[in-house]
C-alpha cells in the first residue's frame, strides 16, 4: 500500500464519491492533486488547439473540461490549481490543510524535491501561491517564485 496516486480533482474527470473514497483509503500523504491541464487552460476565446499550432488537435471547452469536437471523449483538463483546491473542499471531507498538502508537499515528495519545495520554511525555495476565498470560491491572489512576486497577467 506504499503507492501514491495522482488525481485530476476538477469535478469532471472523477466523481465526488471516488475522490472521497481515495482520500479515505490513501490519505493526503499518498495523494497528489494534479491539473494535467492543456494549453487551453485559462483561455477565453476559441478556437482551442492543443499540441502544436501546425498539427495540433482542435478541442471544445465546455463546463470546465476540454472535449474532442465531436464530444466523443475528454481531450484533456483545463483545471487550474485553485480549481483543484475548491473542488476537493467542496466535494470531499478534505480539510484545507489536507487539500493544500495534496497540492504541495505530496507532489514534491513524489518528485524527490521535498528538501526544498512543498513547505514554507527558512532556506526553502519560497515558491508560494497566495489564495483568497470569497463565497466559497478559491482564487489565486498572488504568486511568488523564489520569493519574488510575479506580475499579474
Could you describe each region identified by the protein language model?
Residues 1-11, 18, 23-35, 40-122, ...:
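His/Asp/Glu-enriched, well-ordered alpha-helical/loop segment
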Residues 11-12, 136:
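Short beta->alpha junction loops/turns
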Residues 135-143:
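Short, Lys/Arg- and Gly-enriched loop/turn segments at beta-strand edges
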Amino acid at each position: 500500500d506504499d503507492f501514491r496516486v495522482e488525481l485530476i480533482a476538477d469535478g469532471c474527470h472523477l466523481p465526488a464519491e471516488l475522490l472521497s473514497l481515495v482520500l479515505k483509503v490513501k490519505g493526503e500523504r499518498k495523494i497528489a492533486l494534479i491539473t494535467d491541464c492543456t494549453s487551453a487552460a485559462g483561455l477565453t476565446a476559441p478556437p482551442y488547439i492543443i499540441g502544436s499550432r501546425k498539427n495540433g488537435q482542435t478541442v471544445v471547452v465546455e463546463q470546465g473540461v476540454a472535449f474532442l469536437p465531436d464530444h466523443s471523449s475528454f481531450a484533456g483538463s483545463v483545471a487550474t490549481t485553485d480549481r483543484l483546491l475548491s473542488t476537493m473542499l467542496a466535494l470531499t471531507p478534505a480539510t484545507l490543510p489536507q487539500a493544500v498538502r495534496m497540492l504541495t508537499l505530496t507532489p514534491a515528495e513524489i518528485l524527490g524535491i521535498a528538501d526544498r519545495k512543498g513547505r514554507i520554511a527558512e532556506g526553502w525555495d519560497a515558491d508560494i501561491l497566495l489564495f483568497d476565498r470569497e463565497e466559497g470560491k478559491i482564487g489565486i491572489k498572488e504568486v511568488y517564485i523564489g520569493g519574488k512576486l510575479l506580475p499579474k497577467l
